[in-house]
């Protein structure tokens, strides 16, 4: 969670720096005054993200008397790239489609509650995401314009490999909410954005016929009722 806070702090610092730069331009000239009047906006983004997986336990106890708890002990930043297709509805609202790819991994720790046994598993993912969002922009203040954004993000894991202990589903859908700033530079718009994504479905595969002959590995899945995902995403759009 500390890394997430650092990302948010870095976003605020970068936004403040961008605001100072925009104010410098504000005192001289209004950059790209008709940019927001276009019906379509195209662009791309690069960024980073951290993901978290939350486990709901059911109190399962193995025949040996073991009770296992699973958690994600740390966060590993991932990398993401997106395209941008923005359809203007009116002066304040637009609809965005930002397909992209996310590359990352998550470490999962399995701990025996009453003993000192510990197992670990690294879950690597390559997501194809298809976010559709509604963007609300406030009034432009010279060369800066804040906005809010929200929507849904279907995600498909195309790089998922067979897992020894846990196996996650290849698709999920996220509810997204975020905010950002349009900074109008002389030749393009720079748009830093912070987005929070909340997985809506159980991503744990409960039916594991591949482990029918290895119940010692299946016990981790048996210990869980469900698993849900969350993401915090920091992106920089160029329009």
Residue ranges and their predicted role:
Residues 35-39, 70-78, 121-129, 166-174, ...:
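Transmembrane beta-barrel outer-membrane domains
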Residues 1-27, 236-239:
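Bacterial Sec-dependent N-terminal signal peptides
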């Amino acid at each position: 969670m500390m890394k997430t806070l650092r990302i948010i702090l870095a976003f605020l610092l970068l936004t403040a720096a961008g605001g100072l730069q925009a104010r410098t331009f504000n005192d001289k000239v209004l950059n790209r005054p008709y940019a927001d009047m276009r019906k379509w906006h195209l662009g791309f983004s690069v960024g980073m993200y951290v993901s978290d997986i939350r486990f709901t336990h059911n109190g399962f106890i193995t025949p040996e008397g073991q009770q296992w708890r699973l958690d994600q002990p740390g966060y590993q930043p991932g990398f993401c790239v997106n395209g941008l297709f923005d359809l203007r509805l009116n002066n304040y609202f637009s609809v965005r489609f930002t397909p992209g790819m996310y590359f990352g991994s998550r470490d999962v720790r399995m701990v025996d509650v009453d003993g000192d046994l510990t197992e670990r598993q690294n879950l690597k993912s390559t997501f194809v995401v298809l976010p559709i969002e509604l963007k609300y922009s406030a009034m432009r203040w010279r060369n800066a314009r804040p906005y809010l954004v929200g929507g849904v993000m279907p995600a498909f894991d195309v790089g998922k490999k067979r897992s020894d202990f846990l196996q996650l589903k290849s698709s999920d859908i996220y509810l997204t909410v975020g905010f950002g700033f349009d900074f109008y530079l002389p030749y393009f718009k720079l748009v830093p954005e912070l987005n929070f994504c909340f997985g809506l479905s159980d991503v744990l595969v409960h039916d594991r016929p591949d482990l029918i002959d290895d119940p010692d590995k299946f016990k981790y899945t048996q210990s869980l009722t469900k698993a849900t995902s969350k993401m915090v995403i920091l992106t920089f759009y160029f329009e």
